[in-house]
């Protein structure tokens, strides 16, 4: 097939972790066997923050969920590729799924700019503010904008181009 699909949001990483399901094949919305029918498949995988948890608990949960998802990508590296940029995306072979990482409900940052650096360094490219954190509104912060806003480019100097 020559079909191409870009899906800008899924909570599959959260559910995979909570329900102990693999990325290769599962009964969730996203699985590599389901994506295999597309010549090009791009997925933004959002790590969801459970709003019943405190900001600190959500922050700890985030790292467990993210690490689990990255391990699944690594275990399936022939058919799943983690991307941080358009350049990364152009290197993904036909038939492989390209994943970009995001966080949904960035309240787990909890006003701590250093956490924005940590998210950026952990390969996240977007953070959504929703629910309580945004007063019911949705806002998206891209990694480049977040890096510029928090001084990431100045702090790391040489990575200025990467941040933009």
Model-derived features: positions:
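Loop-centered beta-sheet repeat module
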Residues: 138-164
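N-terminal hydrophobic targeting/anchoring segments and the immediately downstream early-domain regions
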Residues: 1-148
């Amino acid at each position: 097939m020559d079909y191409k699909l870009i899906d800008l949001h899924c909570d599959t990483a959260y559910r995979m972790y909570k329900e102990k399901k693999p990325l290769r094949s599962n009964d969730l919305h996203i699985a590599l066997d389901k994506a295999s029918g597309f010549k090009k498949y791009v997925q933004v995988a959002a790590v969801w923050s459970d709003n019943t948890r405190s900001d600190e608990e959500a922050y700890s949960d985030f790292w467990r969920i993210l690490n689990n998802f990255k391990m699944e990508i690594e275990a399936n590296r022939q058919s799943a590729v983690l991307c941080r940029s358009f350049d990364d995306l152009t290197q993904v072979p036909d038939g492989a799924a390209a994943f970009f990482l995001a966080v949904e409900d960035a309240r787990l940052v909890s006003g701590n700019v250093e956490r924005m650096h940590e998210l950026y360094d952990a390969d996240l490219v977007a953070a959504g503010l929703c629910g309580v954190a945004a007063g019911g509104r949705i806002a998206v912060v891209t990694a480049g904008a977040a890096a510029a806003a928090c001084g990431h480019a100045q702090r790391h100097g040489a990575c200025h181009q990467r941040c933009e």
